[in-house]
Amino acid sequence: MSYIPLPNPLPVSLTGQTLGTGDLTEDAWGVQKVSLPYSLFHGMFTFDIPAKMWFMYEGGTQVYTSTNIVSTDGAAVLTTSAGKTALILESRLCPPYQPNRGVLFSTAVWCPSKTATGCVREWGVQTSGSGVFFRLKSDGLLYAVRRSVGVEVAEEVITTTGVSGFDVQKGNIYDIQYQWRGGGNYKFFINNVLVHTMSLLGTLTALSMSNPALPIVFKASTADAGVANCAIHIGCADITSENGSITEEQWGSAYAENVATNGADKPVLVLHNPLLIGAMVNTRTAHLRTSSFNNTKKCTFKIWRTRSAGDITGETLVAGYGGKYSHIQSDSTNMNAGAVRATAVTVANLEFIYAVTVEAAVRSAQDFPVSHLELNLVRGDYIVVTNDSVNGVSDVVFGWGEEV
């Protein structure tokens, strides 16, 4: 029997090894560059489509239950039908681009009936403004697609002959790797084989993609309402930052003071992360970090979340200090004179998050630390704080870290 003794392990030499491609394989001090993956977002569908992690859309309308977007035997499955010819599964989070770090999107997919009439399937990262993704069209061919500033700037056929036995109708793993920095290259992989490169260095006079902080998106759509087999099956999905780390956040906060409340579930503060910034989808996520509550009476504050403005009555939402520091909006007249406080909320429609009980005139604080347990505010989300005091006066402060 042979073994490797701990005091004298086998020597390891990197001399003569191929250590990366190109000439930038060492840092400024001559230390070999090493790529360590750091997952920014991942999704699995073992039991269901987790609503806290994914949005579902049918015909452009967000839905909260669906018979066309389901979990089947651990896979997410999107299947069109008459009247539901455009389906989207989209991650809640838009993982931020980490400067000077590579981005890697990864998934596993299979697409039955690859030439189904009028059927188009897509998987990758995208919004209406930016994106890079695979597209399977009804000609049975795969395409590499890139979008910037709302315009599809590239749709290029992918040659798959180098992938042994490739069949898009069977389960394969797909990766998209890109450098960005505003002008880097994009590489498409199938089963770990490089099948297509968008070689852009030294060719552009604009950004290769106007926004690199994008959600994972899977789509199935058909121009023929009678086609019922336009489907995409998904194993899991991930966005990784190569050599990445915990994302830096920019501090923001909002407060409401001297808010008279009397009765159950009266609104004290509403926060809103707008769906759009200008005409583009807002991909900045805010993570709630700190909060404090006070009332002249012993009472309970409750924190809720919703995506429907119809659940809130009477409010006018304005970005604090005129949007100088953040696009996050609130109904606090203390933050902006143009705001109007909400007068009522329909709590039956809201997602309950947390409750804090305070003694009369004794401030209580609740922190939400940086961890894998996140309370986030993504594009289109509302956070509502309510109070149940009898003739009380409330003060609330919320602080958040925003991915900019």
What are these regions (language model features)?
Residues 10-12, 218, 359-389:
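Cysteine-clustered segments with highest specificity for TGF-beta superfamily mature ligands
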